[in-house]
Amino acid sequence: MESGGEGMNPVYEKLCACYESIRARIPFTPEIALVLGSGLGNYASKMEVVERIPYGDIAGFPVSTAPGHVGQFVFGYVEGAPIVAMQGRVHYYEGYDMTDVVLPIRLMKMMGAEILFLTNAAGGIRQGFSAGDLMLITGQIATFVP
């Protein structure tokens, strides 16, 4: 991944810069990317952890201001599967540009992840849902992502 060059997309250039700043610290090619939403940050303790990379160590990477968000990538294994997990993430409501909000997902793809699990705290009006239930997203509105 080379950054720079005439006419390169600035979003892609920033992505490449983030990747280059941590490439040597990535211990393996992750197959699975996991975003640990509110209340799930401790899931990383169930992993066989190999490396932790704080977001602040990544050149140009957005850092969360939300309370309780650790702000690091955790590389490790769960039942033999190589995983990169995000402990904390940035949110659009924190004032970040949407390109920064989605940058971590694009970075995990650049690391090699082919499977993505997104988790978050959510509310719903459907009767029968209880705290801790899993809900599957069947559609999304992606009008903000450039």
Model-predicted segments: where are they?
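Short, Lys/Arg-enriched N-terminal segments with co-localized hydrophobic residues
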Residues: 1-7
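Metabolite-binding pocket within alpha/beta catalytic cores that recognizes anionic/polar moieties
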Residues: 7-146
